[in-house]
Curated annotation (Swiss-Prot):
Claim: Protease is one of the keywords in the record: yes
Entry binding sites for Na(+): 165, 168, 171
GO biological process, one term: proteolysis involved in protein catabolic process
Protein's recorded name: ATP-dependent protease subunit HslV
GO molecular function, a single term: threonine-type endopeptidase activity
Protein's UniProt keywords contain Protease: yes
Membrane-spanning parts: none
Gene Ontology cellular component list: HslUV protease complex; proteasome core complex
Active site per UniProt: 7
Family: Belongs to the peptidase T1B family. HslV subfamily.
């Protein structure tokens, strides 16, 4: 049936606020948009954690469930849950086949988690993944640097995804923004 691309996620910590945005497009192969309104950003752990995925949709649901289980196991400790999930993801033969990346965040910490065992905390409080991730990251950094006094975290997240959606064919303007 072809590869599905589940597109762009952007997250930012800014002036004591945090927000994560994701677009709604799911594309099969390089030619067909299958869905315009996929929800790729979710609140987890009683609304205290945000998680967003880019990659295979079915794989992402598996990873959301696994990460939420780790959050419960480690009582909401985001870093510990992310590290333990990455270890399990990398160490399990079946899980290694999953094709997705996650950004997870709470009010103080933001992490990129991948199946290669990477758990990365950005220096600047901004992360972006997916096919439009580079565009969203560049836009977000510029907005945070040059308009930081005038924009909220939610506004930076939404504007960054809008710019990515203008450039990347796998990113649309059906943007969902979640805040903590």
């Amino acid at each position: 049936m072809g590869n599905f691309h589940a597109t762009t996620i952007f997250a930012v910590h800014h002036n004591g606020e945090c927000a994560m945005a994701g677009d709604g497009q799911v594309t099969m192969g390089n030619a067909v948009v299958m869905k315009h309104t996929a929800r790729k950003v979710r609140k987890l752990f009683q609304g205290k954690v945000l998680a967003g995925f880019a990659g295979s949709v079915a794989d992402a649901f598996t990873l959301f469930e696994m990460f939420e289980g780790k959050l419960e196991e480690y009582n909401g400790n985001l870093q510990r849950a992310a590290v333990e999930m990455a270890k399990q993801w990398r160490g399990d033969k079946m899980l290694r086949q999953l094709e997705a990346m996650l950004i997870v965040m709470d009010k103080t910490t933001m992490l990129l988690v991948s199946g290669t065992g990477e758990v990365i905390e950005p220096d600047d409080g901004i992360l972006a993944i997916g096919s439009g991730g580079h565009y969203a990251l560049a836009a977000g950094r510029a907005l945070k640097q040059h308009a930081s006094e005038h924009l909220t975290a939610k506004q930076i997240a939404k504007a960054s995804l809008e710019i990515a959606g203008d450039i990347c064919v796998y990113t649309n303007h059906n943007i969902i923004v979640e805040e903590l």
